[in-house]
C-alpha cells in the first residue's frame, strides 16, 4: 500500500492566522491526495462502519481504539474519498467522529447514548458534537483573528486565503506551523497520543481519564475543600473526603485485624501487606525483597553508592531524604519527639520508642549465650559480637577494628581533630552531639535519670546504671587471674 509523503510539513518562522472553515482544509487534503495518487484505495474501502445503535453501545475506550485504527489507516491511504458536503448527508457516524478528530484537534467523549447533529446558523455547517459547534462558533464571533492566535487550546484551522505551498496551519499548544493540513494531522496525532483525554469545555489535555474526570469539576459541580488554607477544587466525593482527612487527621480506612486507621485506601492496602508478609519487589543485585517500590529504590542505592541528599551544614550525604532530615536535627538541636513520662526529647521517633522501654522495663531481645536482654535488636547483634570476637569495622587510618560502624565513625574524628558540636554558652567543642547534650546539663542543672529505689537523680544514664548496682549488688566485671568480681 502506498504511503503519503508528509515531508511538506515544514515549520515557518512567521506566525500564521489559522482561522477558516474546516471545509477548505478538507478540500485541500482531498485534492492534494487525489492528484498525487490516482490508483490507491479509498477511505471507504478500509472504513469499519457501525450503526447508530452499535456505536452507542461502545464505551469511551473502544471509541478511542476505533479512532486510533482509523487514523492509522487514513495516514497510509493515498487518497480519501470524502465528498465535501454537509456531514448530515453522510451515512457513517464514525466518519464524522474521525473527521472532527483530525480537523479540529479535539478528542470527543460522548456522555449520552444517542447521536445528536448540530448545525451552525451562520454558515450551515453541521457537527456531530455540541462542543465542536461551540468551538466553530468562536470563529464567527471574532476570536482574536487579527493577532494570529488560536482560539481555544487544541483547535486546528486554516488560513482563509491559503493555498498549497503556503503556510496553512498552526497548532497552538506547541506553536509549530505546517504547510499542509495532513502534516499537521500527523503532528496532532503525536501530541494527542501523549494526552488523549481532552476537556470539551477548555480543550485541556490529560494523560489519564481519571485526571480529566477530576478536572471537569472546575467547570461543573466542583466541591471546594472546606479548609481555607487548602483552597483545592475536588470533584469526586472520595477525593474530597481524603483531602479533609489530611487536614483533620481523621482516618476512615481500618484494618479488620488490628483496627489501625488510614486516610486513604492505598495506605490501607500497603499496610495489609505487612500482615500478609507480601514482599513482591525484589532486588536484582542481592535478591532481597521489599513490600513496596520506594523501599526497593532506597535499598538499590546501597549497591550503587548514590547518596543524593546532602547536608548543608557538614556535607554528609545520605541515600534517603528522611535520613537527611533526622541528621539535620543534630545540627539544629530540634527534638520533636518527647517522652510523656519524663519529658526527655528525641530527634528521631525510633529513639523515643527505645527510650519508652526504659520506663516499662521491657527488653524483648535476649542473648542465648549469657541470657542478657536488650531493648533493641541492634543492641543484641552488637552484644553477640562480644562473644564471637567479631569486629567488622576497621579504621583506614590506623587499622583499629570496632564492633559497630558508629564507634568507628567516632574514632575517625580523633584522627581529623574535628569537633563540630559547640556549646553556645561557653564555646566548648565536642566530637559527638551526645557529649554536647551531657555538657549542656552542667549549665541547666538538668538530671533526667532518676533511681527508682532511692530517688537520686543523674545527668547521664551510665551514672544511673552504676548507681543501681549498689542496690542490686551486681558485680559484672570479673578478674580472671584472681577470681575477683568488681
Curated annotation (Swiss-Prot):
There is a cross-link at residues 273, 424 (Glycyl lysine isopeptide (Lys-Gly) (interchain with G-Cter in SUMO2)). GO terms for molecular function: zinc ion binding. GO terms for biological process: regulation of DNA-templated transcription. GO terms for cellular component: nucleus. InterPro entries: KRAB, KRAB_dom_sf, Zinc_finger, Znf_C2H2_sf, Znf_C2H2_type. CDD domains: KRAB_A-box (cd07765). Its main location: nucleus. It is found in: Nucleus. Residues 41-127 form the KRAB domain. The keyword Zinc applies. A zinc finger (C2H2-type) spans 118-140, 169-191, 197-219, 223-247, 253-275, 281-303, 309-331, 337-359, 365-387, 393-415, 421-443, 449-471. Gene3D superfamilies: 6.10.140.140, Classic Zinc Finger. Keywords: Isopeptide bond, Metal-binding, Nucleus, Repeat, Transcription, Transcription regulation, Ubl conjugation, Zinc, Zinc-finger. The keyword Plastid does not apply. SUPFAM superfamilies: beta-beta-alpha zinc fingers (SSF57667), KRAB domain (Kruppel-associated box) (SSF109640). Pfam families: KRAB (PF01352), zf-C2H2 (PF00096). May be involved in transcriptional regulation. Belongs to the krueppel C2H2-type zinc-finger protein family. This is Zinc finger protein 561. It comes from Macaca fascicularis (Crab-eating macaque).
